[in-house]
Amino acid sequence: MPRADIRALRHYLFMVDLKVRITDLNYGGHLGNDRLLGLLHEARVAFLASNGWSEMNCAGVGLIMGDAVLRYQGQAYAGDILRFEVGIGEPRRCGFRLYYRVTRPADGAAIALAETGMVCFDYREGKMCPLPAPVKDLCTSSLGTGERADP
């Protein structure tokens, strides 16, 4: 099976350090794939909060994660501090993409690259809704273009 084609961005808008807990380990003794997705969620919530938003109120709309792509590059263990860098781009009529780079600052190890597709959602109406202008503006700003680094 071919690997997901995810490349790092040239610039990320936000970073947060998170600690790998014992409960984040799988039977192999390293960070489990399900737990990585949970840590990405933590990073996403912190990124949104840094812009004054939340998943329930992102510039006036709710957010739902429509898809996720993870590409593992290395293992992480209990006690490791991981750096989650978050970028934003690819604005669409009803959504956008978030990009993540996960590294271990202690030794510079690459742990993962990931993307999540976020869908704007009106919980009152129970349907997708248009991307708010402030989010679109951030997606298209000079640092939020989603421009990829060279392969």
For each predicted feature, which ranges?
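Catalytic strand-loop segment that frames the active site of acyl-thioester-processing enzymes
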Residues: 1-46, 50
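HotDog/MaoC-like acyl-thioester-processing domains
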Residues: 1-16, 72, 77-78, 88-151
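Short, electropositive, low-hydrophobicity segments enriched in small/polar residues
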Residues: 32-36, 56, 130
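Hydrophobic beta-strand-centered segment that forms part of the acyl-chain substrate-binding groove
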Residues: 47-96, 119
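Residue-level recognition of specific faces of alpha-helices
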Residues: 36-39, 64, 117
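Glycine-rich, flexible loop/turn motifs
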Residues: 21-23, 27, 59-61, 117, ...
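A broad, structural micro-motif
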Residues: 31, 63-65, 111
